A protein has these predicted regions:
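Structural signature of eukaryotic scaffold interfaces centered on beta-propeller domains
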Residues: 107-110, 158-170, 210-216, 262-268, ...
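Beta-strand-rich domains and repeat architectures in extracellular enzymes and scaffolds
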Residues: 112, 153-183, 205-207
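Short glycine/acidic-enriched loop and turn motifs that connect beta-strands
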Residues: 179-182, 225-230, 277-282, 329-334, ...
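Repeat-based blade/solenoid architectures
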Residues: 144, 151-163, 200-210, 233, ...
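Beta-propeller blade signature
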Residues: 187-190, 234-242, 286-293, 338-344, ...
Length: 501
């Protein structure tokens, strides 16, 4: 049995040998957090004390007189008092029936499984259900081994961009921005571990999709590059209809050879930025920032920004500051032009920094620990003359220098008409994959996965055969992690599964 006296704690004693399970302790006294009768009461915080439910001495335990302090140190699951047995049976704890450990593949995690454990023997991980999802308690971090082709997805036509998104309680989707109308662009739903056709939407040489939400409203915006049959040029915002479980037309916005939409929130207000590429043959036109009007339920013009063949917008925040960076591709005479980073000040975006780019097609912002990076995809250098290759040029990674208050070049990577970067993580490892689209001779070019290796920067680890690669998207399901890429040169997109160990 146990006997407690409220005195100062003993020194910690670590035995040299394992405590034998066969040793009888009947009639023994254990002093927990006490120095017996030497000095006063023990008022410290006792940590790492585990009592076995149903032990015969539990009822003899006494805690400190400061009960508020004692509550702080007792796990919630152990705070219930034991139920006294009717006879001489063992003490019963009301939570014991819920302390179950499940083996095998990932079981469901709902309110009825809340508090239960799952041991993943394959990945050597222990998880607890919080009533919604499995939370890792102890897990061996996954490492990327290789990739295998998982699905070849036949698309309506060549695909200029992909957007993967999740609608709560409905599922995982992928929207493809397809070149031709008819048949337009398609939305696919992840069903039985594959993407299957779900909805077709009329589009006009669609370039990209953007998924976003405002409160409970769910939207999907398409950037149309061409005018419709009646010569009207606009891009469209679609809204999710919960009853029909389909996207329906919500708002049309006049655009000019739109390449990209970017959705973001600043101080609780929702915005949309469109990258207008050209108007006729004029590439030096305004791109537009729209603000959501909660009263009318529509997006309205908030600001115009001069751009040159704008291809992509990327929004990001650093602390209290919000930024928007544009990829300028062509000014009518050259691809060697500045792309600009803007900062939000006094209700509008103002120029923060200009960076020389070469047919810039994409920006990708990402963070590794407390370091912030911007990856730039350069597609073409018009200043290079034959026999040199204008498509084999460096794309660059920039890092925010807090002291200098600007982005400085961190690393150059040789790419082949790069048009997209995608950042993703596997376990504790971070990766970048580039979409190489053309090497000056062929569209059959390897796209490369680079792994972050600290002082070395990003190092090539996987070479993936692609054809006219245009866009990469990373996503994860309960069955694993995937990369999906689109081709601008064939009506086929591919899903690759990440194999880990």
């Amino acid at each position: 049995m146990y006997e407690c006296t409220h005195q100062e704690p003993r020194w910690k004693v670590i035995t040299d040998a394992v405590f034998p399970t066969s040793l009888t302790v009947t009639g023994s006294r254990f002093y927990v957090g006490s120095r017996r009768r030497r000095k006063g009461f023990f008022t410290g915080l006792l940590r790492q004390l585990v009592l076995l439910p149903g032990s015969d001495a539990t009822s003899r335990m006494c805690t400190g007189m400061n009960f508020n302090l004692a509550v702080l140190s007792i796990p919630k699951i152990l705070q219930d008092l034991p139920v006294k047995p009717a006879g001489n049976g063992l003490l019963k704890y009301p939570y014991e029936a819920d302390m179950k450990v499940t083996l095998g593949s990932r079981p469901p995690c709902t309110k009825s499984e809340s508090g239960q454990f799952w041991f993943n023997a394959a990945q050597k991980g222990l998880f607890i259900c919080n009533g919604d999802k499995w939370i890792s308690l102890l897990e061996v971090e996954e490492r990327l081994d290789y990739l295998e082709e998982y699905q070849s997805l036949a698309t309506n036509s060549e695909t200029m961009g992909i957007e993967v998104f999740v609608i709560p309680d409905v599922g995982l989707f992928a929207a493809t921005a397809n070149r031709y109308t008819p048949p337009g662009s398609a939305i696919y739903k992840w069903t039985d571990e594959k993407f299957v056709a779900y909805q077709n939407i009329p589009t006009y040489q669609a370039q990209s999709w953007k998924f976003f939400t405002i409160g409970k409203k769910i939207f999907l915006a398409v950037a149309n590059f061409e005018a419709n049959e009646r010569g009207q040029e606009f891009s469209v915002i679609y809204k999710w209809n919960y009853r029909k479980e389909k996207f329906t037309v919500y708002q049309r916005i006049n655009t000019y050879s739109a390449r990209d939409w970017e959705a973001f929130v600043i101080d609780g207000e929702a915005f949309l930025a469109v990258a207008n590429h050209r108007k006729g043959n004029n590439h030096n036109i305004d791109s537009v920032i729209y603000r959501w009007n909660a009263r009318t339920g529509l997006f309205e013009t908030n600001q115009t920004i001069p751009t040159s063949g704008a291809y992509d917008w990327e929004f990001f925040s650093i602390g209290p500051y919000s930024f928007l960076v544009v990829a300028n591709t062509f000014n009518g005479t050259s691809t060697t032009i500045n792309s600009h980073i803007y900062i939000w000040l006094s209700g509008a975006f103002q120029l923060f920094q200009s960076i020389l780019t070469f047919g810039a097609a994409d920006w990708e912002v990402f963070q590794i620990q407390d370091r912030v990076f911007l990856a730039l995809a350069n597609s073409y250098d018009s200043t290079i003359v034959a026999p040199n290759n204008s498509f084999a040029i460096n794309s660059s990674i920039y890092e925010l220098n807090i002291t200098a208050q600007m982005f400085v070049k961190f690393q150059d990577i040789l790419t082949y008409s790069a048009v997209d970067w995608e950042f993703f993580s596997v376990g504790e490892d971070n990766f970048l994959v580039v979409a190489n689209s053309f090497d000056g001779v062929t569209f059959a070019v390897n796209s490369i996965i680079y792994r972050w290796q600290g002082y070395e920067g990003f190092v090539a680890v996987h070479r993936l055969p692609t054809f006219g690669c245009r866009d990469w998207e990373a996503f994860t399901t309960a069955a694993g992690s995937y990369l999906m890429y689109s081709s601008a040169k064939e009506p086929l997109s591919r899903v690759l599964k990440l194999k880990t160990f």
